[in-house]
Amino acid sequence: MRQTIMKVYMDALAGNIGVIRENIPENVRLMCVVKANAYGHDIVRSTLKLWQAGVDAFAVAIVEEARVLRDAGIYCPILILGGASDGSLREAVRIDASQAVYDLHMLDILQDEARRKGKRAMAHLKIDTGMCRIGVRGEDALDEILDHWKQCPDVEMEGIFTHFCVADTDLEYTRKQNEIFKRAIEKARAAGHNPIAHAAATSAMMIPEFQHDMVRPGIGIYGTGVPQLEGRLRLAQQLTTRPVRIQKIKAGDSVGYGRTFIAERDSVIMTLPIGYGDGYSRLLSNKADVLVRGRRAKLVGRVCMDMITADITDIPGVTMDDEVVIVGRQGSECITPEELAEMAQTIPYEIMLGFRARVAMEIVDRYRR
């Protein structure tokens, strides 16, 4: 059995929700984003744990993700954030999931399916305030869809939302987006709707002016991406493996393809069974660390498809039975998605989501030190 395993700690998820709850007002609801298999944390198990922890609602990207939750017997409120085909819109109505809407055709399909099924369709009006992806953009378009909504009596505007594009780097632009959004909320309410307003994802959820009726954290749930809560959130992922070889090499010996590492001294090299075929970026070659016996060991040589190599010369006593941490905590040390993302010239999201199917996942109820 391959010993490269992604452990997901359920108690960390619940604990992170508790920390977030303590830092937002009591009257602000919490919608957790569990798209993309809960950012690589198992969508069904994570959603169940978060629901038990008191989360108000969940968001996914596509109707297929909502269907997975419904098929697992999870009947909590679910919002589908992304665009959708006619068939996907009809499926959203059938499984009682709320759907983001931003044009007249989407409204018409929801209305038709709701009428056919004898139920109410639930929708969240998406406002494009500067992202230029999907959403109602501009006052005229907003007036048009609000007017058209009068012809769709079986579609309830359950929510209204937007998405900030630079909340972590540009507060001034985010405030401009928020002003556009607030005007849209006023218009929707003046038209007779009473939607839940939400805009703040992880980057903005700690800023009171952006919280509205509900916040919508994603990556923060999983233990990262909230500078204001640094040290209080716990990584819910831990990627571990064990050595497949430990060997001594001489000064002048090279390690790996391209001879990119040549030993300057007699060294001890540990080979680990993980590589870019598992989603571990080749850009981490000769840069990243792993943790063994609570200490950092530097990668040497190129990341291969199936293996990486690390220098453990200064860490005595390492054996083939030692657990090696690729992402996560060991002792007082921690390798975070942010750390690896900076080295790989990417974002923490890609690190979290990048590990592939041949990395086994183990759901753990409680972290054991």
Predicted regions and their residues:
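Active-site anion/phosphate-binding pocket segments in diverse small-molecule metabolic enzymes
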Residues: 2-10, 14, 64-65, 84-86, ...
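Active-site-proximal beta-alpha core segment in soluble small-molecule metabolic enzymes
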Residues: 4-8, 12-15, 22, 26-196, ...
